[in-house]
């Protein structure tokens, strides 16, 4: 084995020379230089500084403007809540541990950090799935006369939390476990060992199939059908001007959604899958650290893509920030008209 396994950790460094120490008790400076740990801390500080205000602003603006409290926006707000979970439950902890060079909060703290980070990420992922299904049902109309209402939105929210907990909670109760990963300053699911005592292999397979591949398939399917439907409507010259404009907006949103999702999560999932399927292979701590920390940028991408591109929300946000005035001069009528014009195909 090219790593060192302990009772509740796996360090990707051979202990042939006897230098490996528990990541819960000693700085891990034999894995990387101290300045590299400082860089991780600076990176986490940047994510906190950017991620907290933009996600908090999303919630605040929605509370201030009643017209934003629509069923579809409930799902979008769920993304902001998920990102705040990641910021407070994961990023702040990782910032502190990176400054110390090891996971100073012990196994219990590792469980909590891993749980909140996983929970936030999964809430966001399943929120995107619900959003994709809603767009598919509204635009493609597989069910005639369907209207996405408040009850559907609430059911969608409950679904995202159930699925997120179904992924994040099992390691806390004995099915798999959370351990420090990479440079040992943040915690995640144990992809490194089979650990039969906690049935780790079955959980990782379950997690990849149910909580990664299936959501990815649903997102691709729904938005693929959505683009096809819009193109077909445009080709038939149905409401030509409106449809042509909607086609551009939907295509742009689909491309950004898919690319952002893949950029954020495929590197992490790919490395995790490689580590899991190549038990005992030789890899360094940076190999998992970079994709794990890069995936955390989703807390910034989500509000920018799914909230900031909403014309009505953007107008309300500017009005809130400018103490009730909109220096851009977008009046209520034009905003409402724009929303109505593309309500069937563009983000609400």
Swiss-Prot record:
Plays an important role in the conformation switch to the active conformation, annotated site positions: 113
Disulfide-bond pairs as recorded: 110-187
Keyword vocabulary terms for this entry: Acetylation, Cell projection, Chromophore, Disulfide bond, G-protein coupled receptor, Glycoprotein, Lipoprotein, Membrane, Metal-binding, Palmitate, Phosphoprotein, Photoreceptor protein, Receptor, Retinal protein, Sensory transduction, Transducer, Transmembrane, Transmembrane helix, Vision, Zinc
Ranges in coiled-coil conformation: none
Modification sites for N-acetylmethionine: 1
Residues with the N6-(retinylidene)lysine modification: 296
Region of interest (Interaction with SAG), ranges: 330-348
Residues carrying lipid (S-palmitoyl cysteine): 322-323
Record's comment on post-translational modification: Phosphorylated on some or all of the serine and threonine residues present in the C-terminal region.
Chief subcellular location: membrane
Subunit record text: Homodimer. May form a complex composed of RHO, GRK1 and RCVRN in a Ca(2+)-dependent manner; RCVRN prevents the interaction between GRK1 and RHO. Interacts with GRK1. Interacts (phosphorylated form) with SAG. Interacts with GNAT1. Interacts with GNAT3. SAG and G-proteins compete for a common binding site. Interacts with PRCD; the interaction promotes PRCD stability. Forms a complex with ASAP1 and ARF4. Forms a complex with ASAP1, RAB11A, Rabin8/RAB3IP, ARF4 and RAB11FIP3; the complex regulates Golgi-to-cilia rhodopsin/RHO transport in photoreceptors.
Name recorded for this polypeptide: Rhodopsin
